[in-house]
């Protein structure tokens, strides 16, 4: 789907990769390589930052995670994980649904302040089974 969407939209600077984030985050050019990393309906915030933040460029990159209308407790539980992975304090931004149905959700924005330690992400499956928070 993603390859076809990029082709239909005429996007040229798109590289679709298949694999687990735990493995891909160790590849040169992918780790610390992106200004923006997005995720929607993937996992709790503590797991999500371990899977996604290693891809963001330190000092310039960010993770933007789509969450439901009240992610405060989930974000608070992830505070230690965010710090351990090199993230700055998260910002929760209310967003209107693009579907026009009047639903609201939030975008949780985590700036990448410093490099993620090399021990993260942990091996496949561990971030979900044993979140850092």
Language-model-derived ranges and their functions:
Residues 1-133:
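S-adenosylmethionine
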């Amino acid at each position: 789907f993603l390859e076809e969407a990029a082709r239909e939209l005429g996007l040229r600077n798109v590289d679709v990769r298949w694999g687990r984030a735990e493995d891909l985050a160790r590849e040169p050019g992918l780790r610390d390589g992106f200004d923006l990393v997005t995720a929607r309906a993937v996992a709790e915030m503590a797991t999500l930052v371990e899977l996604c933040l290693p891809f963001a460029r330190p000092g310039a990159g960010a993770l933007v995670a789509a969450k439901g209308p009240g992610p405060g407790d989930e974000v608070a539980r992830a505070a230690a994980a965010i710090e351990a992975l090199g993230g700055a304090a998260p910002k929760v931004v209310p967003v209107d649904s693009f579907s026009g149905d009047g639903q609201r959700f939030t975008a949780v924005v985590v700036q990448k302040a410093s490099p993620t330690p090399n021990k993260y992400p942990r091996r496949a499956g561990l971030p979900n089974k044993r979140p850092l928070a």
